[in-house]
């Protein structure tokens, strides 16, 4: 059969078809190999999973941004939340209640998405209240810093994974650090910390959540199974949200 004008036939006889397993972006074809030893087919599936998780995460962050904007820009909504401790307390408790069914039904569609939406909305209102109680300039600074840190840490983790580095060892260290943060936060309710201690606590908190971003991104690349996309998105969402709130608190205290 004649070839269309401008096209030429290419013989595949001299090409090793098995080499396709090692194709990556550096060769100009396919997608970058996520980490050493990953087969071509598994690499393609893993990239699809990662795109799905980041798609869900982007939707969560967008929803949080929109709800926070509504709370900040609408004084009646803000007054209702800040003037009703019961409502605000309920919104703070709901995410903790939803964590359990989210874990149980993370594979059951569409229940998992409904629970995820409720989880995100309840947290978004609390974030909105925190932003409404802070000067707009500081909120913008915290947002820019958070985006910069998250982007840098994510890029580094993907690069490190490709070079064969593993961050699973961070799990026990970060969990212990998180327990220390929770206990210290509880102690602050009865014995307020001084300015220096508060600054140290804020810096340590930011460091812990930065570590969690690296750890959970590494899990996304290597360890989360393909049906755990909800759990992966929730983990990264909480990491980013906690880092933003920590930076917001540090900047607010520094401004005061």
From Swiss-Prot:
It is found in: Membrane. The chain crosses the membrane at residues 53-73, 85-105, 113-133, 138-158, 167-187, 189-209, 228-248. The keyword Membrane applies. The keyword Cell membrane does not apply. Pfam families: Bax1-I. Its main location: membrane. One of its GO terms (cellular component) is membrane. Belongs to the BI1 family. This is BI1-like protein. It comes from Arabidopsis thaliana. The gene is LFG5.
